[in-house]
């Protein structure tokens, strides 16, 4: 089993430190992990062209940034952790652009796989950012993995983040909970408990 962790920061700093603690915890449980750093490179916004739906190949028509690479890796992953630093009480524009396009083009790649998000800040805005990222999971039938507190850490440097003992413990516990859920899903499949097949009904309120 494998968990894909996405660092929505341009640096390997505080958010990376928190994600690394989640990964360490998962590795202890025999879960393979991979951390992808979005880095400083530009990421396109979704332009609503609809070509991904028309092509039906779970890929974005724009293939000049990291989004399709993430979708490809997501196909092989069993769970996900998305991390973001806080910019003006909000996730980074970079990770939102990635998730908008990845979830729209490759929604079925993520469906019914466990997901979790974490937010890192010097001080405020973590819970608002945390709520925004969770929206991607809850519209995609993804079990949301929680911890012993909201998945947030505080600090302005990696060293300060490590001093947030409760925050780092929350990251470690998140990894344990993710591993437990992945093992439950695997055991269920092995014993004939199949994933649900749900119908979708759409209603437009303005006609």
Q: What label would you give each PLM region?
A:
Residues 1-105, 161-207:
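N-terminal beta1-alpha1-beta2 submodule of the flavodoxin-like/Rossmannoid cofactor-binding fold
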Residues 42-45, 124-126, 157:
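A short beta-to-alpha transition loop/helix N-cap that caps and shapes the active-site region
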Residues 93-94, 104-152, 165-170:
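Short, glycine-/small-residue-rich phosphate/pyrophosphate-handling segment
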Residues 119, 137-139, 156-157, 174, ...:
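Short alpha-helical linear motifs
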Residues 151-160:
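Internal, active-site/partner-interface "lid" segment
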